[in-house]
Amino acid sequence: MSRRCSVSGKGPLVGNNVSHANNKTKRRQLPNLRSVKITMEDGTTKRVKVAASTLRTMKKKAAQAAAAN
């Protein structure tokens, strides 16, 4: 399984751990993925991995669409 958001495509980033002595070692910064059920247009549900920031945006867009109706 890849550690990638299925909606936005966000994936791991590479950075450094930096000690007080300024020693640097490589590290990976992983996205905050959540497994959520999404209802498709035909009524079926599908479980996908979505980044928490993307999930927040999706909820905001859904609330705006509901308020517009």
Curated annotation (Swiss-Prot):
Statement: the UniProt record of this protein carries the keyword Nucleotide-binding: no
Membership in a protein family: Belongs to the bacterial ribosomal protein bL28 family.
Listed Gene3D superfamilies: Ribosomal protein L28/L24 (2.30.170.40)
Name this polypeptide is given: Large ribosomal subunit protein bL28
Gene Ontology MF: a single term: structural constituent of ribosome
GO BP term (any one): translation
SUPFAM superfamilies in the record: L28p-like
Gene Ontology CC terms, in alphabetical order: ribonucleoprotein complex; ribosome
Sorted UniProt keywords: Ribonucleoprotein, Ribosomal protein
Lineage: Bacteria, Pseudomonadati, Campylobacterota, Epsilonproteobacteria, Campylobacterales
Domain of life: Bacteria
Signal sequence, renumbered to the chain: none
Disordered, as annotated region: 1-27
Organism whose genome encodes this protein: Sulfurovum sp. (strain NBC37-1)
